[in-house]
């Protein structure tokens, strides 16, 4: 059975034991968000800004949850401070599932500057990340990176660029 890109992301989250997700609306992640929202085993909290989501997820982690945030990479720029301070200083794990806009094939020019900067921002913040090219790679990457996040108490990111969808 062929698994589509959204199903693979959702399956990766389930495989990884993610039981708490926050999200910011994103057209590329729409189907994944619908799957997460329909799953009673995953508490899903939609938020209006990424920084709010990271705060909610930090509290969920402290309550014993395995957390993820689903967001666009434009929100990564908004979240540098919370990642560099709260998450890094207090060793809070989280899996970031990021719709990576602004990469090759992007139709919206306004997305390109942040698209170019995303990998550099993650490297500067010392956040491990992967850019899977297929549904199978995405599912595997989410599991492996979530394991790294939980073992090291660090944020990790899965970047899903335009070609992934």
Curated annotation (Swiss-Prot):
One of its GO terms (biological process) is coenzyme M biosynthetic process. It catalyses: 3-sulfopyruvate + H(+) = sulfoacetaldehyde + CO2. It is an enzyme of class 4 (lyase). Keywords: Coenzyme M biosynthesis, Decarboxylase, Lyase. One of its GO terms (molecular function) is thiamine pyrophosphate binding. Its EC number is 4.1.1.79. CDD domains: TPP_PYR_POX_like (cd07035). Disulfide bonds: none annotated. It holds the Pfam family TPP_enzyme_N. Pathway: Cofactor biosynthesis; coenzyme M biosynthesis; sulfoacetaldehyde from phosphoenolpyruvate and sulfite: step 4/4. The keyword Lyase applies. Heterododecamer composed of 6 subunits alpha and 6 subunits beta. Belongs to the ComD family. Involved in the biosynthesis of the coenzyme M (2-mercaptoethanesulfonic acid). Catalyzes the decarboxylation of sulfopyruvate to sulfoacetaldehyde. This is Sulfopyruvate decarboxylase subunit alpha. It comes from Methanothermobacter thermautotrophicus (strain ATCC 29096 / DSM 1053 / JCM 10044 / NBRC 100330 / Delta H).
């Amino acid at each position: 059975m062929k698994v589509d890109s959204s199903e693979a992301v959702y399956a990766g989250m389930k495989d990884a034991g993610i039981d708490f997700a926050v999200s910011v609306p994103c057209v590329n992640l729409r189907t994944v968000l619908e799957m997460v929202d329909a799953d009673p085993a995953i508490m899903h909290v939609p938020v209006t800004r990424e920084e709010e989501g990271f705060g909610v997820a930090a509290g969920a982690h402290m309550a014993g949850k395995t957390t993820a945030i689903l967001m666009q990479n434009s929100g990564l720029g908004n979240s540098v401070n919370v990642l560099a301070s709260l998450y890094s200083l207090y060793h809070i794990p989280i899996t970031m599932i990021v719709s990576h806009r602004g990469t090759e094939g992007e139709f919206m020019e306004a997305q390109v500057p942040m698209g170019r900067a995303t990998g550099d921002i993650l490297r500067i913040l010392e956040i491990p990340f992967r850019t899977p090219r297929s549904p199978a790679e995405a599912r595997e990457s989410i599991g492996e990176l979530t394991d790294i996040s939980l073992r090291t108490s660090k944020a990790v990111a899965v970047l899903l660029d335009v070609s992934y969808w």
